[in-house]
């Protein structure tokens, strides 16, 4: 029989002798005989017997129910620990780069449109006319009489805007270094005030860097009352350097196009420097 049952205790019980363990009272010996009996084998029997005696204590190396799963112990191998630390450092670096790239792409998406328009306005690329002329430059220009250029005009209206918009002339002939004046006409046929705003471009695109507008109605809000009709002037010139550019040798036709959109009051397109 296992547990804490000892043959000597059975002998004491059967012979009726007053045997006792040193330090134990007689009552404790009797209690031991009563609680440590056959059938209580193994560690389970010992634990139940000691609980009945009131002397049971949990062994030092035994823990209670775990409140959380044990952590994975770090490797005792120095090389493996260094490798794990290196992987953690690399993962943090990659996450930092990914987050920075995401923020940068978000900022670039907001700034792309105004920056591209400003770039086109400065360089003339993308079919945008160049601003930044001065009165002295205009007064000192020398017309290139033997280089006649045909300028045609086009007008479009976005589906959101219920306006009638058209050029008053279909074409004019100019020479580089000479100013020219053209007109567009816009009408609001509705029964309520409408605010419109226009953009423009020049074709061919390469000619945009030489097409300078002194005065126009683009990128500015235009408010038309019900049934109101207005004339919109465009005062422009073609830079004399147009005639000296080898790329413009075969260019004798330039088209200026305007497109009107409906705008909310107080809204302006973020393109500085346009006239």
UniProtKB/Swiss-Prot annotation:
It is found in: Mitochondrion inner membrane. One of its GO terms (molecular function) is copper ion binding. One of its GO terms (biological process) is intracellular monoatomic cation homeostasis. InterPro entries: CtaG/Cox11_dom_sf, Cyt_c_oxidase_assmbl_CtaG. Residues 114-275 are mitochondrial intermembrane. It is a single-pass membrane protein. Keywords: Copper, Membrane, Mitochondrion, Mitochondrion inner membrane, Transit peptide, Transmembrane, Transmembrane helix. The keyword Transmembrane applies. Its main location: mitochondrion. The chain crosses the membrane at residues 95-113. The keyword NAD does not apply. Residues 57-86 are annotated as: Disordered. It comes from the Eukaryota. GO terms for cellular component: mitochondrial inner membrane; mitochondrion; protein-containing complex. Exerts its effect at some terminal stage of cytochrome c oxidase synthesis, probably by being involved in the insertion of the copper B into subunit I. NCBIfam families: PRK05089.1. Belongs to the COX11/CtaG family. Interacts with CNNM4/ACDP4. Interacts with RANBP2. This is Cytochrome c oxidase assembly protein COX11, mitochondrial. It comes from Mus musculus.
């Amino acid at each position: 029989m296992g547990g804490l049952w000892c043959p000597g205790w059975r002998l004491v019980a059967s012979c009726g002798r007053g045997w006792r363990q040193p330090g134990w009272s007689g009552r404790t010996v009797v209690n031991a005989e009563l609680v440590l009996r056959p059938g209580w084998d193994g560690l389970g029997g010992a634990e139940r017997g000691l609980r009945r005696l009131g002397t049971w204590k949990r062994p030092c190396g035994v823990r209670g129910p775990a409140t959380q799963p044990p952590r994975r112990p770090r490797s005792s191998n120095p090389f493996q620990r260094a490798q794990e630390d290196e992987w953690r450092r690399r993962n943090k670096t990659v996450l930092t780069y990914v987050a920075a790239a995401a923020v940068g792409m978000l900022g670039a998406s907001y700034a792309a449109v105004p920056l591209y328009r400003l770039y086109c306005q400065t360089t003339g690329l993308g079919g945008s006319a160049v601003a930044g002329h001065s009165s002295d430059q205009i007064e000192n220009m020398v017309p290139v009489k033997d280089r006649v250029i045909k300028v045609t005009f086009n007008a479009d209206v976005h589906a959101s805007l219920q306006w009638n918009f058209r050029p008053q002339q279909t074409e004019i002939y100019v020479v580089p270094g000479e100013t020219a004046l053209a007109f567009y006409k816009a009408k609001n046929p509705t029964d309520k005030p409408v605010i419109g705003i226009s953009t423009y471009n020049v074709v061919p695109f390469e000619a945009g860097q030489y097409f300078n507008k002194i005065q126009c109605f683009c990128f500015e809000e235009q408010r038309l009352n019900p049934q109101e009709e207005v004339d919109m002037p465009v005062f422009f010139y073609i830079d004399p350097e147009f005639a000296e550019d080898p790329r413009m040798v075969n260019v004798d036709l330039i088209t200026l196009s305007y497109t009107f959109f409906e705008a909310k009051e107080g809204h302006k397109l973020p393109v500085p420097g346009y006239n």
